[in-house]
């Protein structure tokens, strides 16, 4: 998103957390970003200790910190954070003050002690493709969504807006859990089982819709880029799918998680399965056979073959 903003003509400061020096060092030397494999000329860089300087004069803040770190980063930023929209690409659920699984925007509001003017950026948007100018359709959700769209949308980045921040955030959080399950299904039945994959995908969307509506979101949000679009691209390739595929082929989930974690590849889907299951339980949404099966295999040690063979829905 930093490259998108720069390409739109904005003056951009790219700030890195205390974990991001290996990413910033080559960029500062004029070399390629290690993950994007692109040079990022024209960006001003700021290190972890320069957060206040990075925020000075900002008219828009884009937050790409993962769900484990977003609260701590915004807590540190709070004294210097201007009253401007915060566009978040962070996906997940967090524990709120009521000790329940909650949306990120609600927990961020508690952390900052004020309305954070939060805009959630949802939809299928793989970072490398966005940075390389590949056509991408995103959904910005929140009361400042239009101003965020004006700043970042255009060209290859198509942006629709909605006030349904509950629906958009939940789609983003839930899709990692269901993408892991779809990968698990593919690993179990094989790559040529197209009927089974389609059935599982349709059920995932139905369950996401039930959870979104139960939490006050709208069904139509699930049927757009935030839900169907993001689940499709996440389930097609990537670490969440790979995590599920290995489990589907018979590897114990705990061993796959340990192996991928040791390689720095542990997916958000692992924690997302637990938080999605908790979110559903706390809100009394019970008829979720696919999520129940995914959780049973990944977190309760259920046999993947028996669980998936017994799975029924429709």
Residue ranges and their predicted role:
Residues 22, 68, 99, 103, ...:
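Conserved active-site and cofactor/substrate-binding residues in soluble primary-metabolism enzymes
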Residues 182-186, 213-314:
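NAD(P)-dependent Rossmann-like dehydrogenase/reductase catalytic/cofactor-binding core
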Residues 110-117, 135-221:
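Internal alpha-helical scaffold of NAD(P)-dependent oxidoreductase catalytic cores
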Residues 6, 153, 281:
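Anion (oxyanion) recognition and catalysis
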Residues 42-44, 48-135, 143, 148-150:
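Rossmann-like NAD(P)(H) cofactor-binding subdomain of soluble oxidoreductases
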Residues 88, 117-122, 159-163, 223, ...:
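General beta-strand structural signal in soluble alpha/beta enzymes
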Residues 1-38, 44-49, 78, 107:
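NAD(P)+-binding Rossmann beta1-loop-alpha1 motif at the extreme N-terminus of oxidoreductases
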């Amino acid at each position: 998103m930093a490259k998108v903003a720069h390409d739109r003509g904005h003056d951009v400061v790219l700030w890195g957390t205390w974990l991001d020096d290996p990413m910033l060092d080559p960029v500062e030397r004029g070399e390629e970003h290690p993950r994007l494999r692109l040079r990022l000329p024209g960006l001003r860089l700021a290190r972890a200790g320069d957060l206040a300087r990075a925020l000075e004069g900002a008219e828009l803040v884009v937050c790409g910190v993962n769900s484990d770190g977003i609260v701590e980063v915004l807590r540190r930023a709070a004294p210097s954070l201007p009253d401007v929209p915060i566009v978040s690409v962070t996906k997940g659920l967090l524990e709120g003050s009521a000790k329940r699984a909650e949306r990120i925007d609600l927990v961020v509001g508690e952390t900052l002690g004020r309305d954070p003017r939060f805009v959630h950026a949802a939809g299928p948007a793989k970072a490398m493709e966005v940075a390389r100018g590949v056509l991408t359709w995103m959904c910005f959700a929140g009361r400042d969504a239009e101003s965020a769209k004006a700043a970042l949308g255009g060209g290859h980045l198509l942006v629709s807006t909605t006030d349904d921040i509950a629906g958009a955030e939940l789609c983003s959080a839930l899709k990692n859990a269901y993408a892991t399950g779809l990968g698990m299904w593919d690993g179990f039945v094989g790559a040529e089982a197209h009927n089974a994959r389609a059935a599982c995908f349709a059920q995932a969307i139905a369950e996401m819709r039930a959870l979104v509506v139960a939490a006050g979101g709208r069904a139509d949000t699930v049927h757009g880029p935030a839900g169907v679009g993001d689940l499709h691209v996440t389930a097609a390739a990537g670490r969440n799918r790979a995590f599920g595929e290995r489990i589907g082929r018979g590897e114990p989930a705990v061993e796959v998680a340990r192996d991928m974690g040791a390689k720095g590849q542990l997916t958000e889907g692992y924690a997302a399965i637990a938080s999605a299951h908790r979110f559903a339980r706390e809100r009394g949404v019970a008829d979720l056979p696919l999520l129940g099966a995914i959780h049973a295999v990944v977190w309760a040690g259920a046999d993947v073959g028996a669980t998936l063979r017994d799975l029924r829905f429709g």
